[in-house]
Amino acid sequence: MDKVKIDITILAPVEKVWDYFNAPKHITKWNFAHESWFCPSSENDLKVGGKFNNRMEAKDGSFGFDFIGVYDEVILNERIKYHMEDGREVEVIFEKIDENTTKVTEIFDPEKQNSVEMQREGWYAILNNFHKYVENH
């Protein structure tokens, strides 16, 4: 199955975008696809071989899961690569456009349960939440 690629341009310096993308105190504020969900906890050991765990839960308590991965590559303010527990790979690229503009690109292996379009929409919704959070904080 082909990798899925999404991107968004954020009006903020790359250093801020990197920090807000990786710091657990920020991750819990933006890491959900819909307002009926939230991210109550986040742990992030941002180094090669380090692990992250973002807890995702429906606000009504009906469902929840841990989004877990292990870092394969970390280049400060430029790139992150990780793999999830099921072996799928994700790459996140932070591209400095200018002093106050950053393009974030996510490239990921889709899972087989849901349609590629549904996955693209879900991942993009989270990336868009991130975009709004960074520009408003």
Language-model features, listed with the residues they occupy:
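Generic structural detector for well-ordered beta-strands
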Residues: 5-11, 45, 55, 70, ...
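Hydrophobic ligand-binding cavity/cleft-lining segments
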Residues: 1-38
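Hydrophobic pocket/interface hotspot
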Residues: 17-18, 27, 52-54, 71, ...
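A short, structured loop/turn motif at beta-sheet edges
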Residues: 14-15, 46-48, 72-77, 93-103
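Short, surface-exposed coil-to-beta transition loops
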Residues: 5, 64-68, 87-91
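Glycine-rich portal/gate segments that line the openings of hydrophobic small-molecule binding cavities
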Residues: 38-82
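Beta-strand/loop substructures that line and gate deep hydrophobic ligand-binding cavities in soluble
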Residues: 79-125, 130
